[in-house]
């Protein structure tokens, strides 16, 4: 029974991995991301673009919390 589950697990992984890889490869920088050589102070690096520049995304602004007491 363990062998059967192991074989089914391996087959499941082999079928999922190519789908995930092709999904991630096709993603380019969207309108919220920019390809640059260096990210600005208000951005962080997400991935590399096709020409080896860095895909930068704007950081979310942190809300200032007021102390209640």
Swiss-Prot record:
Biological-process GO terms, alphabetical: defense response to bacterium; innate immune response
Leader sequence segment: 1-22
* The keyword Kinase belongs to this UniProt entry's keyword annotation: no
Keywords for this entry? Antibiotic, Antimicrobial, Defensin, Disulfide bond, Secreted, Signal
Please give the positions of the paired cysteines in each disulfide bond.
29-56, 35-49
Localized where? Secreted
Recorded hits in Pfam families, A to Z, give: Defensin_beta_2 (PF13841)
Q: Which GO cellular component term is one of those annotated?
A: extracellular region
Which family does the entry's similarity section mention? Belongs to the beta-defensin family.
Please give the PANTHER family that the UniProt record associates with this protein: BETA-DEFENSIN 131A
The role this protein plays is: Has bactericidal activity.
Name of the molecule in the record: Beta-defensin 43
The source organism is Mus musculus
């Amino acid at each position: 029974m363990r062998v059967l589950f192991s074989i089914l697990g391996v087959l499941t992984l082999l079928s999922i991995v190519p789908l995930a890889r092709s999904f991630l490869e096709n993603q380019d920088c969207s309108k919220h991301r920019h390809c640059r050589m260096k990210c600005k102070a208000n951005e962080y690096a997400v991935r590399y673009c096709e020409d080896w520049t860095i895909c930068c995304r704007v950081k979310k602004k942190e809300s200032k919390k007021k102390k209640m007491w």
